Amino acid sequence: MLAVAQDTELDRGATSVASGAERTCALTRELKPAADMIRFVVGPGGEAVPDVKRKLPGRGIWVTATRAAIEDAVKRNVFTRGFKRDVRVALNLAAQTEQMIERAALDALAIAGKGGTVISGFSRVETAVGRDDILAMIHAADAGDDGKRKLAATLHRNTTVKSREIVMIDMFTGAQLDLALNRPNVVHAALLAGPGSETFLARVARLTRFRTGILADAVSAHAPTDGA
């Protein structure tokens, strides 16, 4: 059960948040792990800025890391109260935050791709399904159902991977995957264990939680415990 904090004090800067620390949500006043929150600071123009990577200077406030919580915080004037000063707050602050989290996930995918842990192309992905080191299957959000069904059937038939959860990811468009992996026409891909893979999965988990407020069981195993 979450403890209820007694204040919404500003932090003393991004470096003051230790790994595993808890912070008070400025909206709900609940004490939660920092990994489940988004930090906000005041930018040079007096505007509320999402500090998704927790590196921006200045004192910050924390809000539960879901789209619904940030939208509610904007409506309830939480940022002005939390910072104890007038702060300009964009009406689309939740959308801005989501774009940053999505960008961080795609950046991690790019690093994994450069590290050789992302296989793309239908036939190569189909072959990769039998590997012991496969962690996830990635489908473009605009991929056709036929290819997804065939790969799902291949996965279902494979006894090697049946006993463990393979994360299914379909939140990025083909254009986004092309850009992240610097490859043309990426529709299906497989993520293998290796450099950058767990960081990518942690950021996918963070994006999933931000959008839905919940985590699927397979994704939750990779949820960030720090500022992934």
Where are these regions (language model features)?
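Basic Arg/Gly/Lys-rich low-complexity intrinsically disordered segments
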Residues: 1-22, 203-228
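N-terminal cysteine/histidine-rich coordination modules
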Residues: 1-85
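Catalytic cores of RNA-modifying enzymes
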Residues: 1-4, 11, 21-30, 46, ...
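Extended interfacial segments that mediate partner engagement and assembly in macromolecular machines
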Residues: 68-147
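Arginine/glycine-rich "motif VI" loop of SF2 helicases in the C-terminal RecA-like domain
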Residues: 130, 155-164, 182
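Short, solvent-exposed amphipathic alpha-helical segments in soluble enzyme
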Residues: 152-158, 205-207
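Helix-rich interaction surfaces within compact, conserved domain-sized segments
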Residues: 168-222
